[in-house]
C-alpha cells in the first residue's frame, strides 16, 4: 500500500496531498501490476518495489515544475505512463488545467494509458505515434524516463519541437559524465537534484538548449 511516506522528501508533492490523490496513485500502481501480466509495462522484477522504483521516482520530478507558468508537459516514450500519468494525478487537484501529453507508439500500451486516463479523469492527451516522425511540436516541459540516451533526447527536442521551456531527465550514476560529453556538441544550462529513490541517480532540468555550430 502507498502512503505519504513514499513522497515525504518531495517538497512540493508533500504539500496538501489529499488522501484521494494517494489512493489514485495506489490504484494506478495496482493497475500496472495487473496489466503487466498481459503486456510488458515494467520489469516483473520491479513489481514488488513499484511504489519507490516507479511511482515515487516519477513523483519527485514535480519539484522542477513551476506551477505558475507551466501548462503543458510532454512525456516521450512514456510506456506505462511513467512519469506522465503520475504527474497528471498529482497535478489534477492542484492545477486542473495542467495537461500531460504522452507519446507511446505501442497500441497496447496506448490503450492502457487511455483506460487509466478515463478511469481517473485525467487531463491527458495520448498519442499512439512515433515521436521521431512528429514535427513543430509545442510544450512547456519535455520529460523522459528510460526512453532514449541524452543525445537522442536533445536531438528530438531540437528537431521535433519548435517551442519548449526545458527538459527534465532521469540520469544514473554516470549522469555527470553524460552531461559533460553532451556539452561537446550542445550548449545548455542545467539544474540538478539528487534522486530521492536512488543515491546514485540524478534528476536534471535542462534549459537554453542549443546545438553548437561545427
Where are these regions (language model features)?
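Class I SAM-dependent transferase core
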Residues: 1-68, 74, 108-122
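Conserved SAM/SAH cofactor-binding pocket of Class I
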Residues: 59-143
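Short strand-turn motif at the edge of the Rossmann-like AdoMet-binding core
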Residues: 105, 170-174
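Short glycine-/small-residue-rich Rossmann-like dinucleotide-binding loops
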Residues: 146-147
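A short glycine-rich, Lys/Arg-flanked "PGG" loop and its adjoining helix->strand segment in the class I
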Residues: 154-167
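Active-site capping/gating segments
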Residues: 174-214
Amino acid at each position: 500500500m502507498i502512503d505519504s511516506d513514499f513522497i515525504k522528501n518531495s517538497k512540493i508533492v508533500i504539500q496538501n496531498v489529499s488522501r484521494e490523490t494517494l489512493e489514485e496513485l495506489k490504484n494506478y500502481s495496482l493497475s500496472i501490476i495487473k496489466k503487466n501480466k498481459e503486456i510488458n509495462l515494467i520489469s516483473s522484477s520491479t513489481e514488488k518495489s513499484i511504489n519507490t522504483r516507479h511511482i515515487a521516482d516519477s513523483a519527485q520530478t514535480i519539484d522542477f515544475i513551476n506551477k505558475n507558468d507551466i501548462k503543458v508537459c510532454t512525456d516521450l516514450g512514456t510506456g506505462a505512463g511513467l512519469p506522465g500519468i503520475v504527474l497528471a494525478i498529482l497535478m489534477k487537484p492542484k492545477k486542473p488545467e495542467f495537461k500531460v501529453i504522452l507519446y507511446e507508439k505501442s497500441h497496447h500500451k496506448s490503450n492502457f494509458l487511455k483506460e487509466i486516463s478515463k478511469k481517473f479523469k485525467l487531463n491527458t492527451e495520448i498519442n499512439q505515434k512515433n515521436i521521431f516522425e512528429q514535427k513543430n511540436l509545442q510544450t512547456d516541459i519535455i520529460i523522459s524516463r528510460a526512453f532514449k540516451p541524452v543525445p537522442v533526447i536533445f536531438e528530438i527536442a531540437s528537431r521535433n519541437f519548435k517551442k519548449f521551456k526545458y527538459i527534465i531527465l532521469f540520469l544514473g550514476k554516470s549522469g555527470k559524465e553524460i552531461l559533460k560529453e553532451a556539452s561537446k556538441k550542445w550548449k545548455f544550462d542545467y539544474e540538478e537534484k539528487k534522486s530521492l529513490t536512488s543515491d546514485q541517480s540524478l534528476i536534471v532540468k535542462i534549459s537554453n538548449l542549443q546545438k553548437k555550430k561545427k
